[in-house]
Structure formats: structure tokens, C-alpha cells
Amino acid sequence: MSGGYSNGFALLVVLFILLIIVGAAYIY
């Protein structure tokens, strides 16, 4: 149960970081 929650949270963090990187690359 905790493992699935941790996995989902990690995926959310990765997607968020990816969005920031893509956004920065688009701005610059």
C-alpha cells in the first residue's frame, strides 16, 4: 500500500520536474 503511494508520488514528481525543464527550454 505504502509502496504504491510512494511510486505514484515519485512519478508525479518526475512529471513535474520534466514540465519545468521543458518550460525552461521553451522560454530560453
Swiss-Prot record:
Record-level GO cellular component terms: membrane
Keywords: Germination, Membrane, Sporulation, Transmembrane, Transmembrane helix
UniProt note: phenotype after gene disruption: Spores of the null mutant show partial lack of assembly of several coat components, including CotB, CotG and CotH, and impairment of response during germination.
Compartments in which it is found: Spore coat; Membrane
TM helices/strands, residue ranges: 8-28
Gene Ontology biological-process entries: sporulation resulting in formation of a cellular spore
One of the Pfam families matching this protein, by short name: YjcZ_2
Protein's membrane topology: Single-pass membrane protein
Function of the molecule: Spore protein involved in the assembly of several components of the spore coat, including CotB, CotG and CotH, and in spore germination.
Family to which the UniProt record says this protein belongs: Belongs to the SscA family.
Protein name: Small spore coat assembly protein A
Species, as recorded: Bacillus subtilis (strain 168)
